[in-house]
């Protein structure tokens, strides 16, 4: 019951019912309703883009960009292509990073790519992606709870608002750390492969 009831509170060996929903279970409920395509991927794209900032030596950094939108030019330096979460690198047979990188390397949309040696790929670690998505869902759920309490949609008191903000900030820090741990595999094409 403790894990399922929205209005049951527990602290050490004490239990009580309240008219306000338990925030932890509210977060779990909201987490289940987060859309991967509409909410999760845009958040991850934005957060990964922020990690690189503006000071870098690349002609461009393309985060989760389709091959047609990655320019085929020499530019001032190489281009970094950050592969999406569904193209994780693994040392096992489930390695999708190579096939996704090859698609972008070989073609720019429907046309063959001419300057293949100008691309470097950053792939997510296949084993960490599921933890990353889970943490991003937790962050989005806490963020929506804080927004609802502040707007008055969710009836909670000041202590619950502060608890929600602490949980949101903790989830935000964990998400930032996991993003840095996830995108760690650098794939650089070699001359034999490019030919």
For the regions a protein language model found, what residue spans apply to each?
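Extended alpha-helical scaffold and adjacent linker segments that couple domains
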Residues: 2-195
């Amino acid at each position: 019951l403790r894990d399922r009831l929205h209005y049951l509170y527990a602290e050490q060996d004490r239990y009580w019912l309240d008219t306000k929903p338990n925030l932890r279970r509210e977060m779990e409920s909201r987490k289940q309703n987060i859309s991967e395509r509409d909410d999760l991927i845009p958040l991850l794209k934005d957060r990964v883009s922020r990690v690189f900032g503006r000071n870098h030596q690349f002609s461009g950094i393309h985060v989760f960009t389709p091959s047609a939108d990655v320019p085929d030019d020499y530019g001032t330096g190489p281009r970094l292509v950050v592969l999406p979460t569904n193209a994780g690198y693994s040392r096992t047979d489930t390695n999708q990073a190579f096939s996704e990188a090859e698609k972008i390397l070989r073609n720019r949309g429907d046309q063959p790519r001419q300057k293949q040696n100008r691309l470097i790929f950053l792939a997510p670690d296949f084993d960490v992606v599921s933890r990353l998505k889970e943490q991003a869902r937790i962050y989005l759920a806490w963020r929506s709870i804080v927004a609802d309490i502040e707007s008055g949609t969710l009836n909670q008191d000041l202590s619950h608002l502060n608890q929600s903000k602490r949980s949101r900030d903790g989830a935000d820090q964990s998400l930032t750390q996991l993003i840095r741990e996830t995108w760690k595999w650098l794939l650089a094409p070699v001359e034999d492969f490019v030919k």
